[in-house]
Curated annotation (Swiss-Prot):
Chain location of the short sequence motif 'HIGH' region per the record: 273-283
Source organism superkingdom: Eukaryota
Associated clinical condition: Interstitial lung and liver disease: An autosomal recessive, life-threatening disorder characterized by respiratory insufficiency and progressive liver disease with onset in infancy or early childhood. Clinical features include failure to thrive, hypotonia, intermittent lactic acidosis, aminoaciduria, hypothyroidism, interstitial lung disease, pulmonary alveolar proteinosis, anemia, and liver canalicular cholestasis, steatosis, and iron deposition.
GO cellular component: aminoacyl-tRNA synthetase multienzyme complex; cytoplasm; cytosol; extracellular exosome; membrane; nucleolus
Annotated protein name in UniProt: Methionine--tRNA ligase, cytoplasmic
Originating species: Homo sapiens (Human)
Mechanisms controlling activity: Enzyme activity is increased by spermidine, EEF1A1, and when the Mg(2+) concentration is increased from 5 mM to 13 mM (in vitro), possibly by promoting the dissociation of the complex between the enzyme and its product.
Outcome when changing residue 64 to R: Loss of interaction with EEF1E1
Annotated positions of the Phosphothreonine modification: 835
Disulfide bonds, paired cysteine numbers: none
Effect of residue 5 to M: Found in a patient with spastic paraplegia; uncertain significance
Gene (name only): MARS1
Span(s) of short sequence motif 'KMSKS' region: 593-597
């Protein structure tokens, strides 16, 4: 058969990606033709893509061609896939065609483009989130995924048009985009020109009618409540009524924590931070804070959990720092290890072990793995040309030399890796190299070194990845980085250095050398555990019983997904390898980068001097966690999130619920007689709680935080609509209703305190103390919403949880930490000219929007006159527009009315 495609024709993307399905089952010849070539003789207009079958017949519908390839591969049709294909043709394509036309032909940007397709993108995101599966039709990729990916790729390959808040869509799109057939399809059709490659094709298309891009009504945006079945409501009520008796007994505490047969044993690591660096906020969110959230969640689930980290203390970075400070390398390690430990303690990081790599156990385990690799023929010897500084009389390994990156031209690349493009570098490849210590130009000299024979281990690695990746929770960027290295072919990697500070090489002729830090740094996880317990092998040589989660920033991925697995596989000693590799993108500071030397950005040892509590830092860093793409810390945004999400939403609800118990019922939880509306609220809270669990089990940490805030908003609306402060003054029935509303609200507050524990442990403990939540309910989180504060339960003294951040305070901190280059919020890429209002004006507008939104909800709940509701809705829309302008954002196109 023969497949005809053309450059710059969007329909060719999915068919080329789907053609990979037919490999090995049929011979497919791919021919590139011009878009005006008539391939199908009986069509009146030129058409591509076209599949000419061996029978001589033609298929010229994109979905039909894709379906044919999938059927050839043995794929079986299903109703859900067919539904997605119908939706793609009738709903997505018209909206997407309009968006691409506006972008490429008319040169529009931002919401003018995204507005026409936003509803469709949101539908995909909600569907993926609701079913909690990686693909549209379930756990495995289907025809629907390829067809929709191909349709969306020209637009979404630009991150500006992939909304960050649609995280499920983001993850799905990244997963597919990193697959080799999809990458080849994109290269063939777009020719590295991006969406502009479609210009000639789109210019020949008719201008879309307004209806194709329209999503306009006068209804304000509201959160969409899922439709509940009677069974879901009944199950929620049953779980609620069982209360505390549903809780299982607490797991007994172990010391040391060791794997237990028959239980889920979760081993969690954070990438080991270089000891000589004080971590900034980006380092903290990328490794330790993200892992801490998951470790705390694992303990709430009663999983047998061990969480470890430590300082990476060997290597050139330590020697360089020692020279700078006039100390020995060991003195540098001792000094900065304490600094790291103090920072993580202040941030409430709940390590079971925080160790270090300068230990006898590190030497013993590293040398043992090396000897096993050497014995099995996986170590090579070779002569290496190295840079040597004649002035300092030393070889310039790794961080002792800087120069221009040979790949991307970055002027401060190190001798081992470029921080900008992430590529590994041999020091002699640097352009314009300089000694980091004296800044003189080095000379090239030869030296004998040892190499890990990665090409010889590549097949084992690919087989292991083939077993591990399906069904795992590797982040898309981790998969992409790993696959890109394998696609280029692994090369032998030098594992020794001409240094004094490191793990000695136990081989004759190499006594004056040490192991390269990234050969032995990942072995640090094992040695840190060995210093914790002499039974460390029960964790690290037990892949059948241990689930290993490793957290890091994306620049550390190759060493965890390639170098250490190859070392462990080559040693053939049944080592536990990573099951789930969780990598973040980068966190920037305002509109620049963190820089200790320039005094730009907040570093860990400075955060505690700001007067802002550790839990507020934790909340904001997790709220902006760079999961799918780089994100940026913003002082203005920190103020807004604290004052809106924490103070006005979460804190307001929990404080009101507790205060009503104290003020109206003497501090005792009142009797609750649930109405059908109350029972529906139980079911909605239960669904959101289950969504929270689904997200955290998939390590979607930022998204799960949104579930907490959503439940809090439900609670605020519930109180606002039912007005217990008024009902308590009314009839007996009114007072009973006030009691029910108050009792249910304070139980929601109790649930939120437990859900908050992984994110804000101090705030969580404060809420639980105020409510005097029974101890078992503080330490276990089930998937159902339980009544943990029954009628008659006495609560403690209730007080506000959060303090308002003031504009003067934030502006002072901005100036102090070098944020002067970003006195206004970073401008969205889609806006050409904006004027940002002062934070106090923004806050005032946010308060007005909240107040007006409550008025609208109350009127709707009371089924008020339509004209009265419409008038208040108009006020709300106007306030939202004012707020968008004040924040420097384009006012969003109003969304269509949602079906109830």
């Amino acid at each position: 058969m023969r497949l005809f495609v053309s450059d710059g024709v969007p329909g060719c993307l999915p068919v080329l990606a789907a053609a990979g399905r037919a490999r090995g089952r049929a011979e497919v010849l791919i021919s590139t033709v011009g878009p005006e070539d008539c391939v199908v003789p009986f069509l009146t207009r030129p058409k591509v893509p076209v599949l000419q079958l061996d029978s001589g017949n033609y298929l010229f519908s994109t979905s039909a061609i894709c379906r044919y390839f999938f059927l050839l591969s043995g794929w079986e049709q299903d109703d859900l896939t067919n539904q997605w294909l119908e939706w793609e043709a009738t709903e997505l394509q018209p909206a997407l065609s309009a968006a691409l036309y506006y972008l490429v032909v008319q040169g529009k940007k931002g919401e003018d483009v995204l507005g026409s397709v936003r509803r469709a993108l949101t539908h995909i995101d909600h569907s993926l989130s609701r079913q909690n599966c990686p693909f549209l039709a379930g756990e495995t990729e289907s025809l629907a995924d390829i067809v929709l990916w191909g349709a969306l790729y020209p637009l979404l390959q630009d991150p500006a048009y992939l909304p960050e808040e649609l995280s499920a869509l983001h993850s799905w799109f990244q997963t597919l985009s990193t697959q080799e057939p999809c990458q080849r399809a994109a290269e063939t059709v777009l020719k590295q020109q991006g969406v502009l490659a479609l210009r000639p094709y789109l210019q020949k298309q008719p201008q879309p009618s307004p209806a194709e891009g329209r999503a306009v009504t006068n209804e304000p945006e509201e959160e969409e409540l899922a439709t509940l079945s009677e069974e879901e409501i009944a199950m929620a009520v049953t779980a609620w009524e069982k209360g505390l008796e549903s809780l299982p007994p607490l797991r007994p505490q172990q010391n040391p924590v060791l794997p237990v047969a028959g239980e889920r044993n979760v081993l969690i690591t954070s990438a080991l931070p270089y000891v000589n660096n004080v971590p900034h906020l980006g380092n903290i969110i990328g490794c330790v804070l993200s892992a801490d959230v998951f470790a705390r969640y694992s303990r709430l689930r009663q999983w047998n959990t061990l969480y470890l980290c430590g300082t990476d203390e060997y290597g050139t970075a330590t020697e360089t720092k020692a020279l700078e400070e006039g100390l020995t390398p060991q003195e540098i390690c001792d000094k900065y290890h304490i600094i790291h430990a103090d920072i993580y303690r202040w941030f409430n990081i709940s390590f079971d072990i925080f160790g270090r790599t300068t230990t006898p156990q590190q030497t013993k385990i590293t040398q043992d793995i090396f000897q096993q690799l050497l014995k099995r023929g996986f170590v090579l010897q070779d002569t290496v040309e190295q840079l040597r500084c004649e002035h300092c009389a030393r070889f310039l390994a790794d961080r002792f030399v800087e120069g221009v990156c040979p790949f991307c031209g970055y002027e401060e690349a190190r001798g081992d890796q470029c921080d900008k493009c992430g590529k590994l570098i041999n020091a002699v490849e640097l352009k314009k190299p300089q000694c980091k210590v004296c800044r003189s130009c080095p000379v090239v000299q030869s030296s004998q070194h040892l190499f890990l024979d990665l090409p010889k281990l590549e097949k084992r690695l690919e087989e292991w990845l083939g077993r591990t990746l399906p069904g795992s929770d590797w982040t898309p960027n981790a998969q992409f980085i790993t696959r890109s290295w394998l696609r280029d072919g692994l090369k032998p990697r030098c594992i020794t250095r001409d240094l004094k500070w490191g793990t000695p090489v136990p081989l004759e002729g190499f006594e004056d050398k040490v192991f390269y830090v990234w050969f032995d740094a990942t072995i640090g996880y094992l040695s840190i555990t060995a210093n914790y317990t002499d039974q460390w092998e029960r964790w690290w040589k037990n892949p059948e019983q241990v689930d290993l989660y490793q957290f890091m920033a994306k620049d550390n991925v190759p060493f965890h997904s390639l170098v250490f697995p190859c070392s462990a596989l080559g040693a053939e000693d049944n080592y536990t390898l990573v099951s789930h590799l969780i990598a973040t993108e980068y966190l920037n500071y305002e509109d620049g980068k963190f820089s200790k030397s320039r005094g730009v950005g907040v570093f860990g040892d400075m955060a505690q001097d700001t007067g802002i509590p550790a839990d507020i830092w934790r909340f904001y860093l997790l709220y902006i966690r760079p999961e799918g793409q780089d994100s940026a810390f913003s002082w203005t945004d920190l103020l807004l999130k604290n004052n809106s999400e924490l103070l006005n939403n979460l804190g307001n609800f929990i404080n009101r619920a507790g205060m009503f118990v104290s003020k109206f019922f003497g501090g005792y939880v009142p009797e609750m007689v649930l109405t059908p509306d109350d029972q529906r609220l139980l079911a909605h809270v239960t669904l959101e709680l289950q969504h929270y669990h689904q997200l955290l089990e998939k390590v979607r940490i930022r998204d799960a935080l949104r579930s907490i805030l959503t439940i809090s908003r439900h609670g605020n609306q519930y109180i606002q609509v039912n007005e217990p402060w008024k009902r308590i003054k009314g009839s007996e029935a009114d007072r009973q209703r006030a009691g029910t509303v108050t009792g249910l609200a304070v139980n929601i507050a109790a649930l939120l305190s437990v859900m908050l524990q992984p994110y804000m442990p101090t705030v969580s403990a404060t809420i639980q103390a105020q409510l005097q939540l029974p101890p078992p309910a503080c330490s276990i989180l089930l998937t159902n919403f339980l009544c943990t504060l029954p009628a008659g339960h006495q609560i403690g003294t209730v007080s506000p949880l959060f303090q308002k951040l003031e504009n003067d305070q934030i502006e002072s901190l901005r100036q102090r930490f070098g944020g002067g280059q970003a006195k206004t919020s970073p401008k969205p890429a889609v806006v050409e000219t904006v004027t940002t209002a002062k934070p106090q004006q923004i806050q005032a507008l946010m308060d007005e929007v909240t107040k007006q939104g409550n008025i609208v909800r109350e009127l709707k709940a009371q089924k008020a006159d339509k004209n009265e509701v419409a008038a208040e809705v108009a006020k709300l829309l106007d306030l939202k527009k004012q707020l968008a302008v004040a924040e420097g954002k384009p006012p969003e196109a109003p969304k269509g009315k949602k079906k109830k």
